[in-house]
Amino acid sequence: MRRGAVGIGTLIVFIAMVLVAAVAAAVLINTSGYLQQKSQATGRQTTQEVASGIKVTSVIGHVDTTNNAIDKLAIYVSPNAGSEGIDLRYTKIVLRSKSQEVSLYYNRSNYYNGAVDNIFDISGVWPSNGYTFGIVVIQDSDNSVQQNYPTLNQGDLVALTVNANAALGGIKPGTSISGEVIPEQGAPGVIEFTTPSTYTETVVELQ
């Protein structure tokens, strides 16, 4: 009887161990599936964030020959490949010199959509202050870059206009400027240039 009881007890313990192992395996499988799904979702989100964003295609400066300094900046931007629409109302420009940093936001009063010969000759697109920027539409086949709701889509190209005198006190020769064009979502566009040691033209390609 005692041996039988011991045998039954051992069997019960064995069955209990098997059940515990089965439950643990089920928990591990469920956890593994959850983590895999979460990892895939995170990967998709990260890929979208990397793909979306804005890029700076060029930066052009206008030289005030009287003060020998750049008084206007035209920052040309377009969406990254695979990017969704970028609302320029919620995009900001950050500019840094050695001595200061400024942030600029869109002012719908400084907007232009029409023929462009010399961007620096267009009136009404250059802010009078150092904390806003304007928009000059260069290419917009789907008419998404509207004055009140300027949305940058694939294939669009605009110039963001900055009053460099008001924002940075003018940009002298040999000055290093850095910054970003930061959309509400996605990767920012990078601004990085050093002005020439001398200004020989009134229009200077900086980046």
Curated annotation (Swiss-Prot):
Keywords: Archaeal flagellum. InterPro entries: Flagellin/pilin_N_arc, Flagellin_arc. It is found in: Archaeal flagellum. It holds the Pfam family Arch_flagellin. One of its GO terms (biological process) is archaeal or bacterial-type flagellum-dependent cell motility. Its main location: other. NCBIfam families: arch_flag_Nterm (TIGR02537), PRK08541.1 (NF006325). Flagellin is the subunit protein which polymerizes to form the filaments of archaeal flagella. This is Probable flagellin PH0548. The lineage of its organism: Archaea, Methanobacteriati, Methanobacteriota, Thermococci, Thermococcales.
